[in-house]
Swiss-Prot record:
GO cellular component: plasma membrane
Region (Disordered): 31-56
Lipidation (S-diacylglycerol cysteine): 21
Source organism of this protein record: Mycobacterium bovis (strain ATCC BAA-935 / AF2122/97)
Lipidation (N-palmitoyl cysteine): 21
Hydrolase found in the keyword field: no
Protein's name in the database: Putative lipoprotein LppN
The entry's keywords: Cell membrane, Lipoprotein, Membrane, Palmitate, Signal
Membrane topology: Lipid-anchor
Superkingdom field: Bacteria
Amino acid sequence: MRLPGRHVLYALSAVTMLAACSSNGARGGIASTNMNPTNPPATAETATVSPTPAPQSARTETWINLQVGDCLADLPPADLSRITVTIVDCATAHSAEVYLRAPVAVDAAVVSMANRDCAAGFAPYTGQSVDTSPYSVAYLIDSHQDRTGADLTPSTVICLLQPANGQLLTGSARR
């Protein structure tokens, strides 16, 4: 398959053995205050801001839980004999970066749809066209399909960017 002017290095697809996946949850946050102008508080309230987290160390995660902005030290093999990946801080050398998670139907056109969605999501994340960038595109497909085969959707395509020259990335490609 080809994305406009660029070969897709490879496409990994799979039907996972899990019926659903969970997100990694919230990251950081701000405690809100009551600032209703019609009922001002009796005493001054202040907003508390969580401290900036320290750089994230490497962690192992199942690939179906990858989130936009995750940088991967490694990728699962094409045969999916291993379903975990190592996520690292994007400032360190890494093999790929997740730039899009998008719903996709699992049917005969899944490869075409995944290519279309990954191509469309590239420029908004990187600020570059996939044709003129130093990156190649790959993807993983998590079908979320139940084991009866009765429900083929919703499914998720997880789009990854990698250096076209096969070298490692250092830093995020996010604009």
